[in-house]
């Protein structure tokens, strides 16, 4: 169950998106939180030499084209979601506040915990998509640019899959966590393209 923050920060509970509810009216602040702009000092490159300079990268690119998958067609979204009524054994089982919860509250806590984890995966995949897209312009060789573009496309599918799962299955989306946000900010705003490969 989401915890309230102290001070003037918005409560996490107020920032959880519940897809089971009717579309809410968004305030100007909420709209600003959704579309965030970041600036970077990246230097892009054109490479007019279209010869293959690294066969390993060329092979990765070809493999990526061959093994493509489609979120809409390759995942059975109509398959019923099986939700176990069993409460799994967890490391916090002996934590007194958790022990006091009813089974119904424990299941709700686990639902929110799972939704929070899936949300962080989604936000991380969007970060990976943005990093891969930056690499397309920054990579020094033609083949590296092609591979970075295929990687961006793959990350786009990850974003699509997690979004679809959250909106249609868990129906709860948590905001990006502060640790992940800090890491994404550092990577996306760094001007060194080779750092983004790590």
Placement of each model-derived feature along the sequence:
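Eukaryotic intrinsically disordered, low-complexity, charge-rich
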Residues: 13-70
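Conserved oxyanion/phosphate-binding beta-strand-loop segments in alpha/beta enzyme cores
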Residues: 72-101, 115-123
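Acidic/His metal-coordination segments adjacent to aromatic residues that form catalytic metal sites
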Residues: 96-120, 178-198
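Long, hydrophobic, well-ordered secondary-structure blocks that form the structural core
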Residues: 128-189
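Conserved alpha-helical segments that form or flank metal/cofactor-binding pockets of metalloenzymes
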Residues: 53, 57-90, 152-176
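A short glycine/small-residue-enriched secondary-structure motif
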Residues: 93-107, 126-138
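Alpha-helical scaffold segments that form or flank carboxylate-/histidine-based iron centers
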Residues: 40, 69, 111-118, 140-157, ...
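Single conserved hydrophobic/aromatic residue that forms the stacking wall/gate
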Residues: 1-14
